[in-house]
Amino acid sequence: MCIRDSADTARAILEICLSKNPGNELAIMTLAGLHAFAGDRSHIEALAHDGFADDPIIRSIEWILSRNEMPQVHFSRWSMFDTALAAAERSRAFYEFGVWMGDSFRYLIDYFPQGYGFDTFEGLPEEWHGLPRGSYTSFGEVPNILGAEFVVGEFRDTLPEFFAHERPMAGLINFDADLYSRPSRR
């Protein structure tokens, strides 16, 4: 297994978080997952024993641990992007679903001839994990990035029309949407 950047830094940050808020379940599960990826499954097993066995995070960690080949673990999106770029077909277009302020898009577009970004640019359409509606808004401002074409609106409204026409094959897809909403029946 390859752990990119600093597992020690991630562990220290999680421990600080838990010293301030010992009941933070996400931090507890993330720290347990970090220990498990490093070879110590005791924290995951304790959480499963304490009633978290069916939690989606614990189930996801267990599934990953059950694989024959462990994935790389990254502690920054930039490290993850560099790994993805090494495997990407850079002569093709890049697609990003969930653009927000465009930081990831700006980083990735430098490696591709064309980029397409999809977002409402209005933030979360509903409350999500304690974040209020409108969090992650760019206040309707669409980034101005050379080589980019942005499609503004909800995926369920914009993707069918966009992909009804021939589009370049993807060399890389970055899916960074926070919500999955089923399309409404029309």
Regions found by a protein language model. Name each.
Residues 33-93:
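Class I SAM-dependent methyltransferase Rossmann-like catalytic core
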